[in-house]
């Protein structure tokens, strides 16, 4: 009799939970329509993989790319709609969140054709790779729209778990296994630190988890200037710092960049920073509204350390991927300037604009590295000597992307940095902007050093890797060149195109 009653209660409780979930999905599902498209694409990938053979492999790429393009289209159709909060306050939809989601989808869309030839040459499992990329993209999109502490923790974990699996995808490579181990251990530690910071914020606000309600709770409890908030700020900054990888939270970055498959590095190098930047702007700007001076100081220290250490250490690197790892540490220092400036002086707009250009510059560089690595099997900077004599298109593409990363006019990187530094100067961040300008000059040095090697014509400097360089006979070579061309064109956008981009970015402010 007791068992019968307990069984009935279990059925009733399960029914209520199911009905509540169905109600939320029915009435709030339209707010996550782009995410639902990706979920449908994931299900379709699994179904095709379980019922198909090797001949259907092109369909896997087609479904993945189509899902991403359709998700981008859904986002664009929803542009300029009124901000909405859905799923009982867990998710917020507005232009600011959506432009970061657009950037993440753009990264993933460009990374899939970039990966095709690499997957074929290394004979990696295709379906699992695409599943991890789409799932990580989904986690990044949910993080951009997260409106409560639980979602802000769960969404990046979804992204991080896929990142760990992708970084160790080449299981037979010792460097890949080492990179995954370091990435996993440090990622787990940073997640613990982040949750600890959330617990202080939760307790200080009187048990609130929604971002805006936390602010109201801090006002009601008079805890907005308490030591607990300072402790929460420090722990949350450290936790988010792992995702952004500024110095001194950068230790994992060079090893993961060097040991992971190159298409994976290309994907992680941009998507993780875009998602973490979206989360950081909302966390610092809303719950820590009353502690703006404190978090400004913390971020200024991180930006200075990142710009100086990242660019100085990059000079000494001999591996192309390790050089880009330290370069990315310096680049995130520039992005942090936009976060500090905020929306009062166009800081967020300049940050979004620069990240858009950074995506094209960085992915274009990695597309060139993937192409060169597959034909030579090397990642050493010295082995790029004389590439112009064998493959002028690849050498010129790499040179343009590197020059744009360095910020030389009239390339896109120059105008992105110019607008970012100008906003910082207007906000009174004179010392920070001065450091940014000096370190940009340093970065130009090591980029030009690589370009000089690319264009050298002296036989004694050309290594056997370039002397024996052969173009790939694979048809998929067209896909990597497609990504490369798109990124190179975007990296060379002249300043005349800056105004409409900045105007669109300005519309994304809160």
From Swiss-Prot:
Biological function: NDH shuttles electrons from NAD(P)H:plastoquinone, via FMN and iron-sulfur (Fe-S) centers, to quinones in the photosynthetic chain and possibly in a chloroplast respiratory chain. The immediate electron acceptor for the enzyme in this species is believed to be plastoquinone. Couples the redox reaction to proton translocation, and thus conserves the redox energy in a proton gradient.
Protein name: NAD(P)H-quinone oxidoreductase subunit 2 A, chloroplastic
NCBIfam families assigned: NDH_I_N, PRK02504.1
Residues passing through the membrane, by range: 24-44, 57-77, 99-119, 124-144, 149-169, 183-203, 227-247, 295-315, 323-343, 354-374, 392-412, 418-438, 482-502
Keyword Cytoplasm (UniProt): no
A single cellular component GO annotation: chloroplast thylakoid membrane
Record flagged with keyword Disulfide bond: no
Similarity comment: family membership: Belongs to the complex I subunit 2 family.
GO BP annotation list: ATP synthesis coupled electron transport; photosynthesis, light reaction
Quaternary assembly: NDH is composed of at least 16 different subunits, 5 of which are encoded in the nucleus.
Keyword entries, A-Z: Chloroplast, Membrane, NAD, NADP, Plastid, Plastoquinone, Quinone, Thylakoid, Translocase, Transmembrane, Transmembrane helix, Transport
EC assignment: 7.1.1.-
Subcellular location: Plastid, Chloroplast thylakoid membrane
Membrane topology: Multi-pass membrane protein
Reactions performed catalytically: a plastoquinone + NADH + (n+1) H(+)(in) = a plastoquinol + NAD(+) + n H(+)(out); a plastoquinone + NADPH + (n+1) H(+)(in) = a plastoquinol + NADP(+) + n H(+)(out)
One Gene Ontology term of the molecular function aspect: quinone binding
């Amino acid at each position: 009799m007791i068992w019968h009653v307990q069984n009935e209660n279990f059925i009733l409780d399960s029914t209520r939970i199911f009905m509540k979930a169905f109600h939320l999905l029915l009435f709030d599902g339209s707010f996550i329509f782009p995410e639902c498209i990706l979920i449908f694409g994931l299900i379709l990938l699994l179904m095709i993989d379980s019922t198909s053979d090797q001949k259907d492999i092109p369909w896997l790429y087609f479904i993945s790319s189509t899902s991403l393009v359709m998700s981008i289209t859904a986002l664009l159709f929803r542009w300029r709609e009124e901000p909405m909060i859905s799923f009982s306050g867990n998710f917020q939809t507005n232009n600011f969140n959506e432009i970061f989601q657009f950037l993440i989808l753009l990264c993933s869309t460009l990374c899939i054709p970039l990966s095709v030839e690499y997957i074929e040459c290394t004979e990696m499992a295709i379906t699992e790779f695409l599943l991890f990329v789409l799932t990580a993209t989904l986690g990044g999109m949910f993080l951009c729209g997260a409106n409560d502490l639980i979602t802000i923790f769960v969404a990046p974990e979804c992204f991080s778990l896929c990142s760990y699996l992708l970084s160790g995808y080449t299981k037979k490579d010792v460097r890949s296994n080492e990179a995954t181990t370091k990435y996993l251990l440090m990622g787990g530690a940073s997640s613990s630190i982040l949750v600890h910071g959330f617990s202080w914020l939760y307790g200080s606000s009187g048990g609130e988890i929604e971002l805006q309600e936390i602010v109201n709770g801090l006002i009601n409890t008079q805890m907005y200037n308490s030591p607990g908030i300072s402790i929460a700020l420090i722990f949350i900054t450290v936790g988010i710092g792992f995702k952004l990888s500024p110095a001194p939270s950068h230790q994992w970055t060079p090893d993961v960049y060097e040991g992971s498959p190159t298409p994976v590095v290309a994907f992680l190098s941009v998507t993780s920073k875009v998602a973490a930047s979206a989360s950081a702007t909302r966390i610092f700007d809303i719950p820590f509204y009353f502690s703006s001076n404190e978090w400004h100081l913390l971020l200024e220290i991180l930006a200075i350390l990142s710009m100086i250490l990242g660019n100085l250490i990059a000079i000494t690197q001999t591996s192309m991927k390790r050089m880009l790892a330290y370069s990315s540490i310096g680049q995130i220092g520039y992005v942090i300037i936009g976060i500090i400036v905020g929306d009062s002086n166009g800081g967020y707009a300049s940050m979004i604009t620069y990240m858009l250009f950074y995506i094209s510059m960085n992915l274009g560089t990695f597309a060139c590295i993937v192409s060169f690595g597959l034909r030579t099997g090397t990642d050493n900077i010295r082995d790029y000597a004389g590439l112009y004599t064998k493959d002028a298109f690849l050498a010129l593409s790499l040179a343009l992307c590197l020059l744009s990363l360095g910020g030389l006019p009239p390339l896109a990187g120059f105008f992105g940095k110019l607008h970012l530094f100008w906003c910082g100067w207007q906000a009174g961040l004179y010392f920070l902007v001065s450091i940014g300008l000096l370190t940009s000059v340093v970065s130009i040095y090591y980029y030009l050093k690589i370009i000089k090697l690319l264009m050298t014509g002296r036989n004694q400097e050309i290594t056997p890797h370039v002397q024996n360089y052969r173009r790939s006979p694979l048809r998929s070579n067209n896909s990597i060149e497609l990504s490369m061309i798109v990124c190179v064109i975007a990296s060379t956008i002249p300043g005349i195109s800056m105004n409409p981009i900045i105007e669109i970015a300005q519309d994304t402010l809160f």
